Every structure is written in structure tokens, then in C-alpha cells.
Amino acid sequence: TMNGASGSGYLEQISGMVDVKQWSRWFAFMTIILSRETNLSNGTDDDYKLYRGVKDPRIKLVPHDFDTIFGLGDTDTDADDSIFPAITNFAGQTIPQLNRFFSDPVILRQYYSDLKDLLNTVFEKSRFDALVSNSLDWLPSDSDVSDDVIGFMDERRAYILNQIPSEFTVSSNLPSSDGFSRTEE
């Protein structure tokens, strides 16, 4: 189980139980839309479904209840809320297994990659704005909902992209020659 998985083989241990890539993408999606409906994406064991297939028995996450997203709904949100809402829960609850999940370096890289991919495709500004404008065109002309959602997403997109580490550093104890670490071994 995920409860018993730990140590250097953590990823291998859970990969047979859960679809790690799907979970990473699900968490990235829910983080981007900033779901404030209590669910696994924000560290609460509520309002989500699990799916286990026959051919692929790894557990997949299925979202539902989207009435508190993009800064809308009955729960205050800020576009600059954490990109790790599953472990920095706004309601003060935590699920220890998610701390371990996001602490794995391979999963963390996948999560960052999924955030960037979704923000540069599905949530890319022109695509997202058109989707919102076309989907909410039934609202009264004096409604600010479309503008509010678009504005929120602009802020959220910028904030998330700014949180994803982009620098790559390497350190070494090799001897230096002409400013580069070198070895003959």
C-alpha cells in the first residue's frame, strides 16, 4: 500500500499500485484551476473518485464537483496560493502519503513538467480565454464572470510558472581546469 511505501524504492513500490503519471497530471490540473472543493488535490479525503481498471489495475484519480474553481465559489482563493495545495492544505488538514508522493524527486520533476505542459497547452492564454468566452457566452452581458475567470487564470498562470525551478546546477568535487570540473577516470 502507499502507507507502507518508503525509502529509496518508494517510486517503484507505488508504481504498481497507482498510475503515477496520471496522478501527477491530475494534481497539476487541480492545482492550476485551484479547486477549493475539499478533495485529495488540496489534502482532504473527500470529493474525488478512484478508478481501478481490469487490464491496468493501477489506481487512477477522477475529479468531480467543480463549483469552487478559478477563484469562484464560496471559498476565498488567491491566484498566488501554493502550487502544492495537497500538502499545504487551506483547511489545515494533511494526508501524510501525499507528502511522501511529492517528496520523490522523479514525481516532483513529473509534476513540474505537467504544470508547464498544461499551462502551455490547455491553459495557454489565447486558448483558455477563447474557451471561457465561448463557454460562458450565455451569461448576461453585464456579468463579470468571464473577465474574472480570465483575470484569475492570467495571475495563476504567471504565479505557477514563476514557482517552477528553471535553473539547473551541478556541483562536483572534481579538480577544476580552465573553469571546468574534469577527471581522467
Residue ranges and their predicted role:
Residues 1-184:
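Catalytic-core segments of enzymes that bind and process phosphorylated/nucleotide-bearing substrates
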